């Protein structure tokens, strides 16, 4: 079974609308649908902000259902090397605001090469792969974005991927984040962000939906 998560409803809406629904329910007050996409059994849910909630929700679904792989679809802020509308797959994940004695790079969790290869092979869209950095704040200042880029080499930032990756690592589950760039950190205005979010908010999930129709995970 596959678990598909998004922060907000728009980020999983294509799959909610098109899946063959077998069950509807709530877990930790979050709405979910269980059903079939292609030949894959899928559970889809949304509704969390920040690393703590992302980890909490992920673990709850891993405990409730017999999950083999987890996908996180949604949006991210771009760093140097990407532009608005680009789709990024995480091949690794790091918490940029997690201070340790291990050095500036922090603790990096690798993504699933198997999931990555299948999504790239069956998607009809150009996809970038690289490190996704997560933290519990919006990165709106250019200098902060440049610092994160320098320390981590990340393509983009969000508030959840690294947390979900860590939970999946500890539970020995495959994980992949698919994120669409909706703004460039330190460059876009709030108005531009909202416009881009309306345009691209569902794109990552739409890509995964198309892949699941073609491929068995």
UniProtKB/Swiss-Prot annotation:
Which superkingdom heads the taxonomic lineage of this protein's source?
Bacteria
**Assigned keywords, A-Z:** Amino-acid biosynthesis, Hydrolase, Methionine biosynthesis
Q: Tell me if Hydrolase is a UniProt keyword of this record.
A: yes
Q: List the disulfide bonds.
A: none
Broad EC category:
hydrolase
What GO terms in the biological process aspect are recorded for it?
L-methionine salvage from methylthioadenosine; L-methionine salvage from S-adenosylmethionine; nucleoside catabolic process
> Carries keyword Secreted?
no
The record's section on Pfam families has: PNP_UDP_1 (PF01048)
- Coiled-coil intervals in this record? none
GO CC term, one of those recorded: cytosol
Return the similarity comment: Belongs to the PNP/UDP phosphorylase family. MtnN subfamily.
Return the protein name. 5'-methylthioadenosine/S-adenosylhomocysteine nucleosidase
Which species is listed as the source?
Answer: Thermotoga maritima (strain ATCC 43589 / DSM 3109 / JCM 10099 / NBRC 100826 / MSB8)
Q: Which gene is annotated as encoding this protein in its UniProt record?
A: mtnN
């Amino acid at each position: 079974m596959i678990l598909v998560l998004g922060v907000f409803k728009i980020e999983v809406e294509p799959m909610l609308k098109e899946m063959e629904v077998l069950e509807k329910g709530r877990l930790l007050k979050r709405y979910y649908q269980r059903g079939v996409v292609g030949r894959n059994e899928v559970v889809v849910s949304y509704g969390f902000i920040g690393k703590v909630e992302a980890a909490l929700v992920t673990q709850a679904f891993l405990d409730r259902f017999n999950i083999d792989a987890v996908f996180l679809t949604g949006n991210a802020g771009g760093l140097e090397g990407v532009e608005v509308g680009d789709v990024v797959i995480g091949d690794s994940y790091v918490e940029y605001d997690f201070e340790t004695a291990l050095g500036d790079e922090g603790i990096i969790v690798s993504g699933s090469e198997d999931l990555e290869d299948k999504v790239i092979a069956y998607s009809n869209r150009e996809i970038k792969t690289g490190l996704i950095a997560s933290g519990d704040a919006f990165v709106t200042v250019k200098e902060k974005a440049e610092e994160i880029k320098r320390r981590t080499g990340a393509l983009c930032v969000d508030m959840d991927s690294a947390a979900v990756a860590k939970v999946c690592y500890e539970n020995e589950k495959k994980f992949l984040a698919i994120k669409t760039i909706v703004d460039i950190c330190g460059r876009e205005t709030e108005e531009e962000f909202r416009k881009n979010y309306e345009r691209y908010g569902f794109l990552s999930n739409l890509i995964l939906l198309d892949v699941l129709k073609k491929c068995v995970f």
